[in-house]
Amino acid sequence: MKIKTIIILMLSLLIYNHNLKSQTNKNFIKVDRVMLRIPDSMTYSSQNIANYINIKFHSQNDKARAIYCWITESIQYDFDNMYAIDMYNSDISSDETLKSRKGICTNYANLYSDIANKVGVKTYVITGYTRKKKHVNQNPHAWCVSMIDTSWYMIDPTWGSGYIQNSNYIKKINNNFFKIQPNSFIKSHIPFDPLWQFLNYPITKQEFHHGTSKSKNENLYFNFIDTLKIYESQSSFNRLLSSSIRIESNGICCYLDYDNLSDIKFNIKVHYKKVDKELFNSAANQYKKGIFMLNEYIGYANKYYVPYKSDSEIRQMLEDIRITFNLALQQLEKSKYLTSSLENEIHQLKKSINQALVELKKQKNSLDKYLEIAKKYRETLSNSNEK
């Protein structure tokens, strides 16, 4: 009796899934039919395509499907350049892809993301690599993740447009790479940054290479939702820093991981160099300003403090100079990454600032002596100025 009940339940589930899939396919057909009627003149600009989608469709699901349909149908895979993948080029123009009507994974993903975000479907381009069955692909890959309604789904418009067989590209639309759940997608795609697995228990790179799609460490909970919120509030540089930490903790398992992390660290160093140069230039400007103020003060002191200023006003002149030099030193102390040439420049500038501070101290001591000696005389000047 129990076996019979189980069989009935299984059959019911299969029928339900079949009906659900059939209904989904019918919805796809309806959306696809409308999307493929877009005037050709509108298909050479991502904004024009987005405008058409916004007019014809209202739900996020239909909009996402419309984009997937048009890209997989209209963009050819650039087989000749399949190995010319630049994961770190953020200047890939969607309109250039639309003009040529061909591209590799980065072009597909960037085009999808560009249009999706323009129609109000939050989308990110994700980079990583893939596997088919037990074979890990030795080329990096790019795909998308979209927030459709209230859930995150994985979308791979490149794989959805066709496949390679016997060194030939076969154009064949595949709906299996549209709106995939994260726990299913991880079986074939792993992002460099574990954040983009969208799993509370992300698998490691090593587990992926071993054919695992479920983490063995269920004690290590990862709150990807909160981490994503932090990511979205970060500057591009802080995103690099936090991403590099997550990537290292997830493991480096092949040259693709190493190459990706090396590139991130290189960009971090480039940023530090740029910031250090800006800090140095700012410090140099503060130093020049301080020297100008110091020379102005010395000229004033050499004229026996004429025209008259009160004791507190004169002391404030020296204090302002001290603050300016110290600001320059503070800028230099913020330096993170030093090249040998910049390190030498910073050393020389620090030396010059400290020498200027020594001179400033001498001027302060001279002022203290002068104010003490000329106290009665300055009181007379003060009284005459008040009259």
Where are the model-predicted features located?
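Bacterial Sec-dependent N-terminal signal peptides
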Residues: 1-24
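Secondary-structure boundary elements
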Residues: 23-100, 104, 113
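Solvent-exposed, acidic/flexible segments
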Residues: 39-46, 56-64, 91-94, 98-109, ...
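Generic detector of solvent-exposed, compositionally biased contiguous segments
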Residues: 40, 115-118, 333, 339
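Hydrophobic/aromatic-rich core segments of domains that either
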Residues: 69, 108-184
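Residue-level signal for alpha-helical context at structural boundaries
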Residues: 85-89, 162, 346
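Alpha-helical and coiled-coil interaction segments, frequently adjacent to or embedded
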Residues: 165-387
